[in-house]
Amino acid sequence: SSKVMNVYVDGELRDFALVDVALSKERFVASRAIWDMETVFEVFLTRAEPASIGLSSIGARLEEVSLADEGGLQYCIADAEAPTPEDRLVLAPIAPGVIPSVAISSWRRMPDGERISIEKRYCTVALDGERSFAVTDAQQLELEVRRDGPPIIDVNLTLKVAANQGLFNLSPGN
């Protein structure tokens, strides 16, 4: 099985992501606003691979985590208004043609199966950049990386096998 990042609100499973969960200071995030590094303050990843594009590419500049590796990665975006010498500045492609420098205040590996509690605050939780929901400062948000996600298909291998078996050959008699 692949990895998933489960998101719990007040102890109940609310949703999950296959790659990334981003927390934004905004109370509502339009579909493209999650790429605004001035609003994102914390990111949780199931994987962080150097060739990726998106929030996971930032994580890959800190520590590489593949699908085969145990656990995930958590990082915090530094406060742009109050940078510190300890912040780590990385250059990463977060969207095609968008390669900002991003200051990271901290990061750590996340072990499989350990729920991490987030400080209560108003924020928007964005999942894989596809869907989002808001939480209030009265709700407890927790995240956990697990290895019980959906099966993964190797697309390149699948297409290679199909081509070798002639499945794309439309000539008569095949």
Model-found features: residue ranges?
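Catalytic core of DAGKc-family lipid kinases
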Residues: 1-69
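Short hydrophobic-aromatic micro-motifs
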Residues: 15-24, 53, 75, 90-91, ...
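Glycine-rich, charged/polar anion/phosphate-binding loops
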Residues: 3-8, 31, 35-37, 75-77, ...
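ATP/nucleoside-binding phosphotransfer catalytic cores, i.e., glycine-rich phosphate-binding loops
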Residues: 81-174
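Active-site beta-loop-alpha substructure in enzyme catalytic cores
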Residues: 52-96
